[in-house]
């Protein structure tokens, strides 16, 4: 029993010696450089103000600091999508629904070329900053009435090549451009575009819609500059389109004639597209309502003569009349008799693929054309 104390007593000098060596080592000058951290947290420390640093040091001294590790501020991105510069690209992924976790600051969302069939109420929740949305080439046939409500600042909506049968409801008032062509829309109800006073452009061609499919007041309140209803089932110029129109494209329909009152509302038109229809006649005076018209498309119709009224259109510059049944061109069909009555010369007149021979047309017929190369003439029929 006497060996225990003796052992502890004998070890004390050794412990004291080791302790003295450790203290001496710590007191000795060191030539090593201090550790310098490089990484995310260095930037975080650099951005912290002196007050925040002092608070942290005081907490450590008082023992009240809690360890909290924050992850880097990396934005979310739906699985399989590409997110860059507030553009989220989720096209060509075979998606059957709108993906989750779309960053709330997204400006443009690309969902085209997928297999989405429905837009649900909360699909775009939180995306109030969205500027453009592409849903082109999906299988969407159903849209919840409140699906677009969160999109307070959206200006462009691309909805072509889907299975829509009606215009979606409650579209954002901020909308400027909408493309809903190549769907299955047969009817546009009254007030379908209500509240869209900022809308500038609507492309809704290639829908199986007839004239009767546009209810009275369908376009009420719109101040459009551009409207295209091509490749549809129209047999006449639709009624009550926006008076503000600058461009109206009704090509590739089944329109058979242009009546006197058809164009009365559209005094602001610059460009009118009526090509690829079945038009045999434009009633005398029907073009007189278009004083600002610059470009007129009547190609691929069944006209037998140059429409009346062209010489009185002071700003008309381009007329497409090719591929018709025009067999004769009069000397005053294009140009006014009085000098200086026309404000701008023609820079394009197409008459090829008509049964009229160019040598039978008097040179004075084109006296108000800027250059003879602007006249496209030929004697072949497609």
Regions found by a protein language model. Give the residues of each.
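A generic tandem-repeat structural signature
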Residues: 117-215
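Consensus "Asn ladder" position of solenoid repeat domains
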Residues: 93, 114, 135-138, 159-162, ...
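A structural signal for leucine-rich repeat
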Residues: 100-103, 122-126, 145-151, 168-174, ...
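LRR N-terminal entry segment and analogous cap-like coil->beta motifs
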Residues: 82-132, 245
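Leucine-rich repeat domain C-terminal region
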Residues: 201, 207-214, 222-224, 294-382
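Leucine-rich repeat
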Residues: 96, 117, 141, 164-165, ...
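Terminal targeting and flexible regions in eukaryotic proteins, enriched
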Residues: 1-87, 325, 360-382
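Conserved LRR concave beta-strand detector
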Residues: 87, 108, 132, 142, ...
């Amino acid at each position: 029993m006497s060996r225990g104390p003796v052992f502890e007593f004998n070890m004390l000098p050794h412990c004291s010696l080791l302790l003295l060596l450790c203290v001496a080592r710590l007191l000795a000058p060191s030539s090593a450089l201090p550790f310098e951290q490089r990484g995310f947290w260095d930037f975080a420390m650099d951005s912290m103000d002196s007050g925040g640093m002092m608070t942290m040091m005081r907490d450590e001294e008082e023992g009240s600091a809690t360890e909290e590790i924050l992850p880097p501020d990396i934005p979310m991105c739906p699985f399989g999508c590409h997110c860059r510069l507030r553009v989220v690209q989720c096209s060509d992924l075979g998606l059957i629904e709108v993906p989750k976790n779309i960053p709330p600051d997204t400006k443009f969302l690309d969902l085209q070329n997928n297999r989405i069939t429905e837009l649900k109420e909360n699909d775009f929740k939180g995306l109030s900053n969205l500027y453009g949305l592409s849903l082109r080439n999906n299988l969407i046939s159903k849209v919840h009435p409140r699906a677009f409500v969160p999109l307070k600042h959206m200006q462009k909506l691309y909805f072509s090549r889907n299975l829509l049968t009606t215009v979606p409801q409650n579209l954002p008032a901020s909308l400027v451009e909408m493309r809903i062509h190549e769907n299955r829309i047969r009817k546009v109800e009254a007030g379908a575009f209500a509240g869209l006073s900022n809308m500038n452009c609507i492309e809704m061609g290639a829908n199986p819609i007839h004239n009767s499919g546009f209810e009275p007041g369908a376009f009420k309140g719109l101040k459009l500059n551009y409207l295209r209803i091509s490749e549809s089932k129209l047999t006449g110029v639709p009624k009550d389109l926006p008076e503000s129109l600058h461009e109206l494209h009704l090509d590739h329909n089944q329109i058979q004639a242009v009546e006197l009152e058809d164009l009365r509302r559209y005094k602001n038109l610059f460009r009118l597209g009526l090509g690829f229809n079945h038009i045999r006649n434009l009633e005398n005076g029907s073009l007189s309502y278009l004083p600002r018209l610059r470009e007129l498309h009547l190609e691929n119709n069944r006209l037998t003569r140059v429409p009346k009224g062209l010489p009185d259109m002071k700003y008309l510059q381009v007329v497409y009349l090719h591929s018709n049944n025009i067999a004769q061109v009069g000397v005053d069909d294009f140009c006014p008799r009085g000098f200086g009555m026309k404000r701008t010369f023609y820079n394009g007149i197409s008459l090829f693929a008509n049964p009229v021979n160019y040598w039978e047309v008097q040179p004075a017929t084109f006296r108000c054309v800027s250059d003879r190369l602007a006249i496209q003439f030929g004697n072949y029929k497609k």
